[in-house]
Amino acid sequence: MQATAVVETASGKGYHSNGGNLQKDKPSNPKKENLLLSSNGCDEVKLTFPDDDWNSSTLEQRANNKEISNIDKMDLLEPFFSVSQDTNTESTQFQSSELEDSTDYAFLNKTYSIPYSESKLKKESLTPLSSELDPEVQKKEEVFFNILEHQDKTVGLERIYNISDANYRESAEDTQKHDTDEDSQQEYHSAEEQEYISNHLSFDQTKALDISNPEVVELGNSGYEVKCASNVEDNRVNSGSGSIISFDSLDVYGQEESLHVSKFQNSVMLREYHDLKHEKYKEQETNSMYHTVFDGSVLRSNSPGNQESQSKSGSLSPQKVLKMKIYTENMKSQINEGKDFCGNKIVENKILLHLENPSTLPQDKALETLLQPCKDCQTSWTSVFDDSIISACGYYESLQNTADSALDFSAMLPKIAVRDNQAIEDNTSLKVAHSSTTKKTCFHNIGEMCTKSLTDAASCTVTINQTVDVSTDFRACFTTSRATSARPSVVSTSSNTEITMMNKKRPDEWQNEKQKSVACSTDWSYSEDCIDTQMAITKGSGKSLSVDSLKPNGNFLNKDFLELRKACGITDLKKHPEREFQLFKDTEKDLPSMCCQKIMQRAIKAELHLLNVHYQMCRRHCCDIYKLVMENREGLNMNLSSNSAKKELGSALLSLLGDLKVRYVTLKEKIHKGIPLEELPPLSLESKLLSTFSTFASRLMKKETHVFSEADAEQDNQRAHDVDVSSNLKKTLSQMSLSSDNSHATQNISPKKDDFKNGDINADFSQLKLGDKDCRHYQETSEDWSDAKESLTGVDVSGTQGNQVEQDTWNLDLTGEMKNVEPSQRDKGYLIHVGGLCPSVSEADLRSHFQKYQVSEISIYDSTNYRYASLAFTKNSDAKIAVKEMNGIEINGKSVNVWPVKILGEYTSPLSSKNGNRISSNNLEKSTNKQIHSEFSISRLPRTRPRQLGSEQDSEVFPSDQGVKKNCKQIESAKLLPDTPVQFIPPNTLNLRSFTKIIKRLAELHPEVSRDHIINALQEVRIRHKGFLNGLSITTIVEMTSSLLKNSASS
């Protein structure tokens, strides 16, 4: 079969496409041409010859049909486009109760306008063509077109369709038709021979519309019911295999009975590219391609027996509303109907309106359109055509571009794929010939009004959502009821029932689509992939386009694309999705910053609150220390001036609080600047007040040591006797002078010599404790501290109230008193000392060794580096024998040293033998009595640890009534107590042993310096270190003190 499309020009000459070439043709009927206009899912109106058979009877029937009598030349010298976003035009739905026959295409006589709303294109379902035409349908068609013949009336046909939710996508398969004879026999060729034809419309230069390749137009969506309305009557047009043309929102200007078309939301712009008057139609001008884009126009045909469906309002374009006014003169359409010819119309007005729609491709195969400015600031459209089939997707988007303030809309030019071996550029028109498998891509350069033809266009890709396969028979798919599933994605007008795709494969996105009945509502929500495709298409200029090829060997037109994109300006878009998306991104960027600011403010408040709490705690701490010091001063009945003490402590407190506040304010300012609290130095409290307290208390203690001794005695709760003493030292002496009848007489120690009374013999037992210390590691302690004269002042044995005796006087008195001690009292207790015991020696071992000497009591004492035992005997003779026999004996592998603590008439002081270099011993040797020396040592011992003697007061054993066991306990308790120097040093500063070592080393380094000066220098070093020497090594302290002594000596 061959099909010849005849296009009649002003001169009566026609051209037909045969074998891919445009040939001059003498039409059999110059007044008649068969033309079928249809629109696919993307609102492209196409020219097609859907019937398989075309014979000579077709021409005869055409001759018999009603001719278009009053076809004047269409004058489009001044086309006017009115654009309105807010225009709401009523629409009339044209319904067809029985779409069994083909519906003819009609052209309007008068002016009409098409408003375009701001909606977005939806997908369209496919509409098949039927190849049979009944005589009854022909009659109805004649009635229908008679109504349209009135010159003073314009009938608007509205196509409003709804696309089912992601159900149908249209994919076009190329088919090439060749004209072989004048009889217009049609032949469907293979998909490889199909071609794309791209045409372009211009505004102000077009006076007449012509179609360069009106052969085959792809079918539109199925299931549409069109209602033709006019002032006379409503006609229901039945179409068997024909088609119905419905123009969206056609308004009649100057007519009383104007057809109100419904408001719809999709828009396509009408473009007229060249201004060709009908008088000057010549051979070259017939090839000019004019595109009239009607976003609502659809040509539909339905198979016999199919149910009718209403076409509802659909949303086609998300952009502006464009009103296109076409001022035409008398136009009549002639219907040439044949038995086997389906709805082909010949329009004699020398104008062929080609309805097209730019296609928007699916998300993954998006075809981004381009914008090109015209010389007159007009935007125009190009579309994708093929010689045998024109395919487009089911939804598309048109962007706004303020190219012209009068239009106030934007259009984007899609990429054009043309399959042809000839891309002929004739002046400002494009000739596209068939008969070649070579594909070329042409772009209309509006600025130059010419078309660029690119080689190797076989790689040019056009991705579509819906496809039409002309190799299959559409009757095979739609001969049943429309209520049945219309899943097939292709509609064919040929006898071949196989579904063959253009790209020989089914797109992947189809496999996930759902099937839906054609009869059901085709309303569907705006798909996400449409939004994504819109985002891809509406990218700003200068960005490369991404077009996925459906062809195996596809090439991008990147270079041309970029050039065209650079030439185009996308400015002033009132509703740009990319801008909205960018605004959303900016908002997202701002949100985290706002949240961070709030979090930062909360953190700063929390840190300030924490700092304030710390500051208040430090203030409270300072105030508590101040109160504690003042209360202790008053409670201790200090003899110093309270005013001076208050001033000193008060000034220290105020200074400390001032420094604390300054640091607090500084830290607060830094926190306000954003510095974290953890990075700032802590608000530590300077220990000025503590240092002052330590120094001040040390000075007080140096003068009133007995007060602290009394406090120590009270803490031990060892006051078991009712001795009324005025001082702690008196109490201690009374505890040691227990009588045999447990009567606690008050000691009347006078500053004179003759009054030392009973109980002082007991000092002989107490000396053992001092000797035990010397046997231990405290030998240096005893000798270092015994030479300090000031230490004797604090422990004056004449501790009665008002005692003012000098130290030396007290020593002489004590010597005289000890000489008068009765010998009978000295024979009442015998103790021996066993030193050098190994750790494994137990009390049982000692008892086994000294059992023959009748030991009454054994006491073992341990220290860090020395272990010894005290043994009590009832008889002096036993004690003497034990000392002689057991001295030097080995116990558990280690020899021991045994010496008597007290043996009447033969007593020798172990301290005198071991520590003969003691300075204190020299003072006592003036009395030339070893016993007095021992008793002097005893007199120093209660001063050292008086609080423990009270607990052991009942352990003092006299030969008359108590055993030696009590004395041993007293020795033990005295030995285990820590030593305290006379000079007051806080407990946390230095222990006695370290202090002793420091004093000894300093005495060796500075033998010319007295002990008092050394102690004062050490005290000054401690004050310089805020009252504490903790953490400093002994060597460091010695060096610092020595340096201070040298400086003071030099000054």
UniProtKB/Swiss-Prot annotation:
Main location: cytoplasm
Annotated S-S bridges: none
GO molecular function: protein homodimerization activity; RNA binding
Residue stretches of biased makeup (Basic and acidic residues): 23-34, 169-180
Cellular compartments per GO CC: catalytic step 2 spliceosome; cytoplasm; intercellular bridge
InterPro entries (UniProt xref): Nucleotide-bd_a/b_plait_sf, RBD_domain_sf, RRM_dom, TTC3/DZIP3/RBM44-like_helical
Source species, domain of life: Eukaryota
Ranges of Polar residues composition bias in the record: 299-318, 735-750
Modified positions (Phosphoserine) in chain numbering: S388, S391, S546, S726
One biological process term in Gene Ontology: mRNA splicing, via spliceosome
Residue ranges constituting the RRM domain according to the UniProt record: 830-903
Location of the region described as Disordered in the Swiss-Prot/TrEMBL record: 1-36, 169-190, 296-318, 735-758, 939-964
Keywords of this entry: Cytoplasm, Phosphoprotein, RNA-binding
Keyword flag Lyase: no
Cell compartment(s), UniProt: Cytoplasm
Coiled-coil residue windows: none
Oligomeric form and interacting partners: Homodimer. Interacts with TEX14.
The protein's name: RNA-binding protein 44
Source organism phylogeny: Eukaryota, Metazoa, Chordata, Craniata, Vertebrata
